[in-house]
Amino acid sequence: MIETKRLYVRLFREEDAEALYKIKTDPQVMEYCPDLLDVKVEREDIPRYIREFQALEDSGDIDEWRCYAIENKETGEIMGALTFSKQKMLHEYELGWMMIGAYTGKGYASEAAEAFAEYFCEGHGIDYLIVVMDVDNPASRRTAEKSGFRLFEKRTVYDYSYNRYCDDYFYFRRYWTGSILKDRYYGDSPYYGR
């Protein structure tokens, strides 16, 4: 479990099934993250997914997709989720987030992402994490920047994702503070690393 000033970032538990279903069915989440779990997942399927998350965590294999709860320390409410996976095409570790609409714009996602990135990189000896997002998602761009990710480049690929065709996306990186590579890639140009 990761603790921040206002949050816990932890594995989902079976008692969080309703909260995870709420995240999965939130219209704001679905706009950019329709592939969270399976597209046609039903409420009764959620506990099985949570057990799979636990099994993946227990396996220690960091190359497999994972999903963590973002919990409000004060209220115990699950407000969103962080996802982590080894991006198949890029062969890099990718972090993602999704917040229930009522909790957006309050800095929770950036607080969770920053803490998770530092904790995970340090714990696994990973130099950096990436975030990949549609250029039409300005809220996620702000979250990435607030949590220490820097725009590395804008890439083009013709892909059907997020329920629509997307040809441009932003590619961000956040280096672990202990990484010797950090200074090599974080320059002063608008596209860091170029």
Language model region names:
Residues 1-102, 123, 164-194:
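GNAT-family acyltransferases
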Residues 130-132, 150-167:
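Conserved catalytic-core motifs of GNAT/GCN5-like acyltransferases
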Residues 84-86, 117-118, 135, 161:
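Short, contiguous, well-ordered secondary-structure segments
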Residues 97-99, 105-119, 138-146:
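Conserved acetyl-CoA-binding loop-helix of GNAT-fold acetyltransferases
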Residues 9, 20, 95, 113-116, ...:
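Hydrophobic packing within well-folded, soluble alpha/beta domains
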Residues 12, 119-121, 149:
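Conserved hydrophobic/aromatic "anchor" residues
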Residues 41, 138, 159-161:
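Generic structural signal for helix capping and beta-alpha/helix-loop junctions
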Residues 106, 122-127:
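Short coil/turn segments at alpha/beta junctions that flank glycine-rich nucleotide-binding fingerprints
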